[in-house]
Amino acid sequence: MDLGISGRTALITGAAGGMGEATARALLGEGVRLVLTDLDGDGLAETAGRLGAGDRAATVVADLTEPDDVERLKREAGEVHVLVHTAGITGAKGDPLTDITDDDWLDAWHSDFMSGVRVARAFVPPMREAGWGRVVFVTSENVAQPYDDEAVYNAAKAAVLTLVKGMAQRYAPDGVLVNSVAPAFIESPMTDYMMEKTAEEEGVSKEQAIEDFLEEDRPHLVLGRRGKPEEVAAVIAFLCSERASFVVGSNYRVDGGSVASIDL
């Protein structure tokens, strides 16, 4: 299927692996020029090498919690038609009142929410002026199904979704369509780190830690496995395309059936 975006330029944040890299690969296959950014410079270079896109993929190492870095990213990226914001952290875990500090809350706020505000502020106004744009944020299953030990992540991702809804309503008349995807337990550097840490703490293999997590913490994930980054990227690529020209403010769940509730 031709998504109708060949020749466009997409900025992908959090591009050093996982969903960011998978999205880059999907869009590259549609003839899109890429600007890839991440705080992890080595990981970003490795992603670019695996993509093998040559001059069709530029890389910019940037910390999106730093306004000056976002301004530099804007200068180096040039004209951008598509923004995909996957960057973020899981944040501290534990009792939201007794275990989580003010700094923990602020770290998640800046990494998961304000980073998105900053890149949108930098790149969406020119899209509005041009009369065309696509913006896709990554939220989480936690928005619909908060977990009691992930309060900072729950709150930050819920804030992202409300940002998406507000931006979608305001900018759609100008041709800029804003949507989001809500993954569950996806294969990524982030979940790899979580599972490796759990495995070390419990004295088991990473594979056993994943199996235990699915059985004990995510029994409602009906497919019983981690999702693949490519499965999320396929939905993101659709939302970036001309094929999604009547989709505004939607939050697509790519969660293996983890969330069973109905959106009204």
Where are these regions (language model features)?
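Canonical Rossmann dinucleotide-binding motif of NAD(H)/NADP(H)-dependent dehydrogenases/reductases
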Residues: 3-35
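Catalytic Tyr-X3-Lys loop
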Residues: 81, 98-117, 132, 136, ...
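Short C-terminal tail/terminal secondary-structure segment
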Residues: 94, 236-237, 248-264
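Active-site helix of classical SDR
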Residues: 120, 156, 164
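Short, small/polar-rich loop/turn modules that mediate ligand/substrate recognition or access, typified
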Residues: 172, 177, 247-249
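C-terminal helical subdomain
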Residues: 180, 203-243, 247, 256
